[in-house]
Amino acid sequence: MKKKLTGIVLLLLFFAMPLQGQAKVKAPKKQCHAYAVMDAGSGEVLFGQKANKKIYPASTAKLMTAIVCVEKGNVNSVIKTKSDVVYRTTPGTYSLGIGAGVNYTFKDLLHMSLMSSAADATDSLAVGVFGSKKACVEAMNEKCKELGLKKTHFDNPVGSDIGAGYNETYASAKEMAKICRYAMAIPLIRSAVSKAHYSTQKGGMYVNTTNWFLKGMAYYDRDTYKIIGSKSGTTNAAGHVFIATAADYEGHELICAYFGNVSKESTFASIRSLFDYAFNNYKKGKLTLTPSNYDVRSSQKYGAVYSEYSALHCYPAQKDGLFAPNKAITRKQL
């Protein structure tokens, strides 16, 4: 068997059998509208505060826009911006000033949307892929139905809400965590939200992230875990919001969907404390976390192949966390 394994570029991570049932821990109280902390491996909400309450997602809605655009569009295409889109962006939003009549790659617009939260880039991507913002929104709501989300609805691609006259964009912390979990299983989206800076391939734009963790403007315990990305936002109705994804060094990932703090500083500080609390309780044996390869969470493309590995608590992966099964290894050999 050693000969068969020689030269295979796999990282085999073996984990002990999980405990029977999930241990419960008390949810810390936070000054916010709602939050949910989810185990990304299993999709289970570990603890939260008013996690099913109606909230306004603000620009975290762009995660769903990104999902439907990546799944529908040609990610290697070039999109020419239109004046009636970039100069008439959805009200109550921030624009980067990408200009009209400029050719950007699909990936350029995606990065500007997710990293800097640019409404002009988001609307341009939506129109470039679907032909209209309305068609994009229809796809977003269809995706909500597909994912079984009953408390989430969108009426624009960028996350404008009741404060700007968009009354049909709303969600819950739990369901936005589910949307983030799905988005973070798509390699292109995962890559975009993990960057602090980005230079567009076309158009000459330089993009900075709004994620203070990635910019080094918000402290967290890097010896225990690493913040690997996701999306921020703010509106008057939503308050300051952020959905963060963190990974420890054993293959576990947590998602914290946090909505409605009074300031950006306190939002990031609260999320850090919730990640600290969750990972520390895991170390103490009070929480069970589920390791997994991120690209199979919301996909059935590997079918029984992945099940053969996960049944034995063996997770073959490349260094970036993608599932990389070795077909030469049988269940018996594992």
Regions picked out by a protein language model, each given a short descriptive name:
Residues 3-22:
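Sec-dependent N-terminal signal peptides of Gram-positive bacterial secreted proteins and lipoproteins
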Residues 85-87, 219-220, 280, 314-316:
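Active-site/binding-pocket entry motifs
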Residues 33-36, 107, 140-144, 289-333:
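N-terminal propeptides
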Residues 21-174, 183-184, 324:
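Active-site-adjacent loops and short helices of periplasmic peptidoglycan-processing enzymes
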Residues 27-32, 131-291:
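Penicillin-recognizing serine hydrolase domain
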Residues 41-42, 250, 320, 333:
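Residue-level recognition of short loop/turn positions
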Residues 86-98, 200-206, 299, 328-330:
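Short, mixed-charge aromatic SLiMs
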